[in-house]
Amino acid sequence: MSNSAMSVVILAAGKGTRMYSDLPKVLHKLAGKPMVQHVIDAAMTTGAQHVHLVYGHGGDLLKHELTDPALNWVLQAEQLGTGHAMQQAAPYFADDEDILMLYGDVPLISSQTLGRLRQTKPQGGIGLLTVKLDDPTGYGRIVRENGAVVGIVEHKDASEEQRQINEINTGILIANGKDLKRWLSQLNNNNAQGEFYITDIIAMAAEEGQRVEAVHPERLSEVEGVNNRLQLSALERVYQREQADRLLLAGVMLLDPARFDLRGELTHGRDVVIDVNVVVEGNVKLGNRVKIGAGCVIKNSIIGDDCEISPYSVLEDAVLDAECTVGPFARLRPGSELAEGAHVGNFVELKKARLGKGSKAGHLSYLGDADIGSGVNIGAGTITCNYDGANKHKTVIGDDVFVGSDSQLVAPVSVANGATIGAGTTVTHDVAENELVVGRVKQRHISGWQRPVKKK
């Protein structure tokens, strides 16, 4: 076991040719965030003093996406192997610290496995993460003598006897900084690939009499890499099933775990029910007895106790108090707030709007930049006209207001408590308390009207 301080190196310089994309491979997303961000997050949980990111292709894109100031960016101008990548980072290694080596395209490595690897590393020597495969073709084999790890041989360089070994190298290892710098300086590229292999340091350590201790991950998926979109989609399904299983065991009822996507963090109360094809993004909090209908997208939102979100509704940066109902086919955009018992119905859109206690907007309305009191009825087709072509303006509606269907409120405008807006009215001036406002075109009756007929 090593008690030394530790830094992490993440190799992320590969182009990812088999992704057939202009995006660097490690920026392709798994569960809504770049693969390499998953690795960075795992690294940050290890207590690492420094995280060195070795990059090459698409450096500008990487730096634009990964903005954590704790990252130390290390350029690998030419991709000449894993050993060469580590050589670029070596000047940053302290002699008295351990160096943990990770890969930006191995996104599901867990902090628990990394913790066990760190605990396994001997005071002098190397801790190595390995797995056993039924078909190890293409992978570097772990060579042992009398049970002790003495080397790693790459598949292309392996003899027929060595190719029968089913214990393979994952590439993830931990070693002392001083030792690692010495071994890296001794690497050569005398192999079939003409590259500098980091794996050659295992034999160097064994020749020096230093121990190499191997540990296995809890799950094979933790060490599976991504080289193409098929592999990425497979790991996406693995990850999503793991999240679904965790939520089920915690008491969330997922009606079909295979059709649920979590792309962030979900906290929840008791007896939550989530229907099929729901996507949860960012940080979402669900209270007790919340029901989410099929096909909903919930992003960075807080939903209170006993709320029901009907199918195909989209909520982003919204806050709902208890007993609210939303949808179906409703959209709550950033800044939407619903007080207790409020209702937003089908084809209603809110943006920077607050709907007071017990207020209802049942159908076909747009409420933007609006503060709406309690007990308000918003009729079908109501629009708060908040944009004048250059600036946004606010609509304020008091308590117990009735807004008739097909009304327009041209902001900035205020409607006081108890007022009534007749159907089809365009409100351009403030409305006083308990007033009735009607502003529609006078109805005409034309007797004997003949409808037009189609020309032959």
Curated annotation (Swiss-Prot):
Cofactor(s) this protein requires: Mg(2+)
Kindly list the GO CC terms recorded for this protein: cytoplasm; membrane
Positions contributing to acetyl-CoA binding: 380, 386-387, 405, 423, 440
Catalytic-site annotation from UniProt: 363
> Mind listing the GO biological process terms from this record?
cell morphogenesis; cell wall organization; lipid A biosynthetic process; peptidoglycan biosynthetic process; regulation of cell shape; UDP-N-acetylglucosamine biosynthetic process
Main localization (coarse): cytoplasm
Q: How is the cofactor bound?
A: Binds 1 Mg(2+) ion per subunit.
> Where, by residue number, does Mg(2+) bind?
105, 227
Quote the pathway field: Nucleotide-sugar biosynthesis; UDP-N-acetyl-alpha-D-glucosamine biosynthesis; N-acetyl-alpha-D-glucosamine 1-phosphate from alpha-D-glucosamine 6-phosphate (route II): step 2/2; Nucleotide-sugar biosynthesis; UDP-N-acetyl-alpha-D-glucosamine biosynthesis; UDP-N-acetyl-alpha-D-glucosamine from N-acetyl-alpha-D-glucosamine 1-phosphate: step 1/1; Bacterial outer membrane biogenesis; LPS lipid A biosynthesis
Q: Which reaction does it catalyse?
A: alpha-D-glucosamine 1-phosphate + acetyl-CoA = N-acetyl-alpha-D-glucosamine 1-phosphate + CoA + H(+); N-acetyl-alpha-D-glucosamine 1-phosphate + UTP + H(+) = UDP-N-acetyl-alpha-D-glucosamine + diphosphate
Keyword set includes Lipoprotein = no
The enzyme's main class, written as a single word, is transferase
Subcellular location per UniProt equals: Cytoplasm
- Quick one: which residues bind UDP-N-acetyl-alpha-D-glucosamine? 11-14, 25, 76, 81-82, 103-105, 140, 154, 169, 227, 333, 351, 366, 377
State the residue spans of region: Linker.
230-250
| GO molecular function term, any single one | glucosamine-1-phosphate N-acetyltransferase activity
Locate the region Pyrophosphorylase: 1-229
Under the heading Pfam families, the entry gives: Hexapep, NTP_transf_3
Stated EC number for the protein is 2.7.7.23, 2.3.1.157
Swiss-Prot/TrEMBL keywords: Acyltransferase, Cell shape, Cell wall biogenesis/degradation, Cytoplasm, Magnesium, Metal-binding, Multifunctional enzyme, Nucleotidyltransferase, Peptidoglycan synthesis, Repeat, Transferase
What this protein is reported to do is described as: Catalyzes the last two sequential reactions in the de novo biosynthetic pathway for UDP-N-acetylglucosamine (UDP-GlcNAc). The C-terminal domain catalyzes the transfer of acetyl group from acetyl coenzyme A to glucosamine-1-phosphate (GlcN-1-P) to produce N-acetylglucosamine-1-phosphate (GlcNAc-1-P), which is converted into UDP-GlcNAc by the transfer of uridine 5-monophosphate (from uridine 5-triphosphate), a reaction catalyzed by the N-terminal domain.
The family classification in the record reads: In the N-terminal section; belongs to the N-acetylglucosamine-1-phosphate uridyltransferase family.
Subunit organization: Homotrimer.
Q: What is this protein called?
A: Bifunctional protein GlmU
Tell me the organism: Pectobacterium carotovorum subsp. carotovorum (strain PC1)
Q: What gene name does this entry carry?
A: glmU
